[in-house]
Amino acid sequence: MAAPIDVKPKHGFSLVTSSAYHLKILSDLLKSNIKEQNARVNNKGIFIRGADEKENTLIDVELYASALNMEPPSSETKIGIVFSHLHEIMRRIKRKDSLHISRDEGSDQLNFNIMNAEKDRDKDAFIRLKDIQDDPWDVPVYPEQVICTIPASEFQRMTKENAKQKYMTIRIQKRGVKFIAGTPQQPQLSGMEDRYGKYKDGEDDLYCRVFETKQLTKLAKVNGLATNNFLKLYWLDDEHPIKLESAIDLIGRLCIYISPVVVAQVPTAQ
């Protein structure tokens, strides 16, 4: 077992961004899927990788130092964040607010200063950082070719409309994807389905698996991460998760890796 992270030799850093509202949405998304995790902070930016309790959803965040007006730490440091604590602060942010985040040299807390555009509202807060043991999640390299893009607003609508269904089936072809309410063995009578890209009935599927609908519903917040946001869908092979990639305004990117639940043997052909 790896030794616990020593948070005593701490390295200071700070950043200022006008994309505070998008970071608020990101904090909500992280809280809904991950309990706690270390963030790596270095001269390239801030990196967070963590999974839900069942490890069926893995989220990978990259925030760019160059887009955050960041003064990086003198060397790479790790900060242990409880995401429910982070969201308690971030939920106070309103549209057009700016955000200053800092950590003083030798401190075990992360400081937040929320400012509005008129500079007549200024809120200070902090969270305590926590000792968290790293989980070694690795992600495979996916082909650069995108299967298709999905409007984030449509993804949010679809997950909300199907929230009462326990399962959803995802079928992938070379240039398209279809989401179906229910499982192949028990499709819902409503016949709800959504297609993106150039999915065609009659063509063989590369992939067909069953997912818990709540797993997808907890990702609906991706719609708020950027203006006119789109999700890029990538597929590697039958044994690896589906990859969804989203911009985080102009300051970073989010990759989500979702794995299916096992309900029954599912045919891979239409």
What kind of feature is each model-predicted range?
Residues 1-31, 36-164, 169-270:
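DNA polymerase sliding clamps and clamp-related checkpoint/processivity subunits
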